[in-house]
C-alpha cells in the first residue's frame, strides 16, 4: 500500500517549523511512507475582494493569498497513493510514535482527532466551548451539541485519508476547484463568524455534510501544547498558536524540555 505524509511549509523560516518538519520527515522514513514538504504556494487561494470580511493584510502579507488553504493540495496525490496523512508544520512527532496509517482501517473515509477528546486545562475547555459555538452553531450539519464540550469539531492539523473512500467526495475536481466551490465561499471570504477561520472550519463542515465515515482518532495523535494536561503521553505534539509560545516558538530547547 502506497502511503504519503504531506506537509506545507511556506513563507518565513522558523526554528520551530524546521524542528517539527524534520521530526515528521524522519518519522516518514521510519514507517516507510513517502514524504513531501511543499515549500512554495501552489493554490494561492484569495478571498473575493468585493465581498470578503477578512482584512487586506490577512492575505497581502503572504503575497496576496491565504496559506491556510495550501495543504489541500495534498488531494492531488491520490493518483499515486492509497493513504495520505496531512500534518501541519507545527506538529512534532516523537521517535517512539507508532505508524499512524494503521490507525485508519479500510472502512473509514477520514480520520482526525476531536479536539474536545483531549485531556485539557479548564481554561482551554472553556475556550473551545465558546469557539465551537461561534464557528459551528449556524451551520446546518447533523451533529450533537454537548453542554460541556460544545460541538465535536476535529482539529485539522492532523488528517488521515483513505483514497478508496475519500477521493470520491472530490468529484474529480482539482484541489483548487474543490476549495473554490460556491458552498465554501463564506469560509474563504471570512463572512460573519468565519472572519479568522482556517481550513479547519471548512473541512469540519464538509466531512459532516457529506456524512463521511469518520474515525475519531485517539487524542495522542494530535495533542495541543499548553492546553493538554498529559502532553508527555502524546505521539504527536501540536505547537499551535506559534506567536503565543515562549519566544514565539523559537526557543525549541525549552519546548523540547517541556514535552520530553
PLM features: residue spans?
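N-terminal anchoring/stem segment of glycosyltransferases
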Residues: 1-59, 66-70, 79-80, 194, ...
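Conserved beta-strand termini and adjacent loop/short-helix elements that scaffold enzyme active sites
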Residues: 8, 38-40, 113, 217-220
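Short, charged, surface-exposed secondary-structure boundary motifs
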Residues: 18, 119-125, 246-250
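Non-transmembrane alpha-helical segments in soluble domains
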Residues: 25, 102, 204-208
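A glycosyltransferase accessory/donor-loop signature
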Residues: 46-52, 93, 145-155, 163-260
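A conserved donor-nucleotide-binding helix/loop in the catalytic core
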Residues: 48-87, 93-102, 110-113, 154, ...
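Conserved donor-nucleotide/metal-binding helix-loop-beta segment in metal-dependent transferases, i.e.
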Residues: 93-135
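Short, flexible, basic/aromatic active-site loop/helix in glycosyltransferases
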Residues: 132-150
